[in-house]
């Protein structure tokens, strides 16, 4: 059994990503683990509602990130904003900080869409030095329902 003391929850603020949050919180409570909530900011991608100015955008994303808080105040939470390629930064951050488990959502893209856009979750599963739990929101399910779960472990 893997001892889980540090959990990383990377988010892109989508309903798919939010779905994994329930699992990250539950696991943090169960194992008495700390939780790091990570958003990787990509400056060359325009996001509706986010400022165009790079410095203002960083402030905006940091504010969005810090709004994510577990109801249980006993869970130690750290918010981290990084810049770069999401999959690479998630993997690097997990390795550099000794994360035991990454809990993340997936959009569940298939076919041409996946080929063109790639899969952050797939790259993290492939490259992470720790175990990864991927939560997929079933089609047509409201975001309050828990989704399907896939786990890949590393020793």
Where are these regions (language model features)?
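Short, conserved glycine- and acidic-residue-centered signature motifs
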Residues: 17, 57, 117-121
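Gly/Ser-rich helix-loop-strand patches that form or flank binding pockets
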Residues: 93-143
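Short, well-ordered secondary-structure micro-motifs
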Residues: 20, 47-50, 89-92, 114-115, ...
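Small/aliphatic-rich secondary-structure junction motif
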Residues: 2-55, 140, 150-155
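Short, solvent-exposed amphipathic alpha-helices that sit
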Residues: 23, 53-67, 89
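Structural beta-alpha unit
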Residues: 1-2, 16, 70-102, 139-144, ...
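General small-molecule cofactor/ligand-binding pocket signal
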Residues: 36-38, 78-82, 133
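Short glycine/serine/threonine/alanine-rich loop segments
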Residues: 27, 33-34, 75, 99, ...
């Amino acid at each position: 059994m893997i001892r889980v003391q540090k959990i990383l929850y990377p988010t892109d603020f989508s309903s798919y990503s939010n779905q994994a949050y329930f699992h990250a919180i539950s696991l943090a409570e169960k194992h008495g683990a700390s939780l790091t909530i990570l958003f990787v900011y990509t400056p060359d991608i325009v996001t509706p509602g986010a400022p165009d100015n790079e410095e203002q955008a960083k402030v905006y994303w940091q504010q969005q990130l810090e709004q994510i808080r577990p109801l249980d105040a006993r869970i130690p939470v750290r918010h981290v904003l990084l810049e770069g390629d999401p999959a690479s930064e998630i993997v690097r951050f997990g390795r550099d900080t000794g994360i035991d488990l990454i809990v993340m959502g997936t959009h569940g893209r298939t076919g041409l869409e996946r080929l063109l856009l790639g899969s952050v979750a797939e790259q993290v599963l492939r490259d992470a030095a720790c175990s990864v739990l991927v939560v997929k929101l079933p089609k047509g399910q409201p975001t309050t329902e828990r989704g399907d779960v896939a786990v890949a472990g590393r020793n």
